């Protein structure tokens, strides 16, 4: 009886760990890189869906985006051009 409880507990903890890892790491990274690739080519429905997913997976976007900064940002180029 005790070993069955322990094995069930490990299964539940493992399932929570996998779901948490997907929610906090894998899906936000996928969305971030997808948006970097498709940013200038998205239609309005794709953009709306992505914004909804970003809102859903928001907790780690602040953390992840602080490490992955875009290299070719149009906003940065415009600021660099305006400052000269």
UniProtKB/Swiss-Prot annotation:
EC number: 7.1.1.-
Domain of life, source organism: Bacteria
Topology in membrane: Multi-pass membrane protein
Subcellular location: Cellular thylakoid membrane
Pfam families for this protein: NdhL
Keywords: Membrane, NAD, NADP, Plastoquinone, Quinone, Thylakoid, Translocase, Transmembrane, Transmembrane helix, Transport
Catalytic activity: a plastoquinone + NADH + (n+1) H(+)(in) = a plastoquinol + NAD(+) + n H(+)(out); a plastoquinone + NADPH + (n+1) H(+)(in) = a plastoquinol + NADP(+) + n H(+)(out)
Transmembrane segments: 10-30, 48-68
Disulphide bond pairs: none
Class of this enzyme: translocase
Keyword Translocase set for record: yes
GO molecular function: oxidoreductase activity, acting on NAD(P)H, quinone or similar compound as acceptor; quinone binding
UniProt GO cellular component terms: plasma membrane-derived thylakoid membrane
Function per UniProt: NDH-1 shuttles electrons from an unknown electron donor, via FMN and iron-sulfur (Fe-S) centers, to quinones in the respiratory and/or the photosynthetic chain. The immediate electron acceptor for the enzyme in this species is believed to be plastoquinone. Couples the redox reaction to proton translocation, and thus conserves the redox energy in a proton gradient. Cyanobacterial NDH-1 also plays a role in inorganic carbon-concentration.
Assembly and oligomerization: NDH-1 can be composed of about 15 different subunits; different subcomplexes with different compositions have been identified which probably have different functions.
Family: Belongs to the complex I NdhL subunit family.
Protein name: NAD(P)H-quinone oxidoreductase subunit L
Organism: Prochlorococcus marinus (strain MIT 9211)
């Amino acid at each position: 009886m005790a070993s069955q409880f322990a094995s069930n507990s490990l299964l539940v903890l493992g399932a929570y760990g996998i779901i948490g890892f997907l929610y906090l790491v894998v899906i936000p990274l996928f969305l971030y890189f997808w948006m970097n690739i498709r940013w200038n080519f998205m239609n309005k429905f794709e953009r709306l869906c992505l914004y909804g997913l970003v809102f859903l997976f928001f907790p780690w976007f602040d953390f992840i985006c602080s490490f992955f900064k875009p290299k070719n940002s149009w906003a940065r180029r415009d600021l660099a051009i305006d400052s000269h």
